[in-house]
Amino acid sequence: MENGAVQQLQLLGKRVKGFGVGGRYVAHPYYSGRFRELLGCTPFPGTLNFDANLDWRELASMCEPQVIPGTVWDGVRLGAVYVWKAKIMTRHGYVDCAVIRPLLSGHPPTVLEIVACEKLEPILENNPDKTVIVTIACKRGDALRWRRY
């Protein structure tokens, strides 16, 4: 495969409850501008959390993330965030999204968050077992095989 070619990595996980603070960070001007660049829209002010059964560090080693660096904004420390461009399967088909892992997260290392242009819960509600299927676009020079978790 050509160096820099886009390859795909599929993650299979279960929705989990968050801490209720994702919306505040997604809506923050520092982060929302970065998500707007990546997604081409103003992101919905909230995240959908899922347990990917894959440690975020393993994901980062397999699929290099974009990094939103940490900063201090009006005296408040904002942590760095790893970001992967992705698509999430919904009852309407695939929807563009970003899979993120805030480096200051209080979640276990297998919990990732999804940012999208629209609220995802309503278009995932017909999924009683709370399964989440996400396809991440990876840019890597090495051969990465399609994997399911």
Swiss-Prot record:
Residues the record lists as binding FMN: 105, 113
Record-level Gene Ontology MF annotations: magnesium ion binding; nucleotide binding; riboflavin kinase activity
Catalyzed reaction equations: riboflavin + CTP = CDP + FMN + H(+)
GO biological process per UniProt: FMN biosynthetic process; riboflavin biosynthetic process
Keyword Ribosomal protein among record annotations: no
Keywords, sorted A to Z: Flavoprotein, FMN, Kinase, Magnesium, Metal-binding, Nucleotide-binding, Transferase
Annotated residues for binding of Mg(2+): 47, 49
Cofactor binding remark: Binds 1 Mg(2+) ion per subunit.
Cofactor needs: Mg(2+)
Major enzyme class: transferase
EC number per UniProt: 2.7.1.161
Pfam families: CTP-dep_RFKase
Similarity section: Belongs to the archaeal riboflavin kinase family.
Name the record gives this protein: Riboflavin kinase
Species assigned in the record: Hyperthermus butylicus (strain DSM 5456 / JCM 9403 / PLM1-5)
Organism taxonomic ancestry: Archaea, Thermoproteota, Thermoprotei, Desulfurococcales, Pyrodictiaceae
Recorded name of the encoding gene: ribK
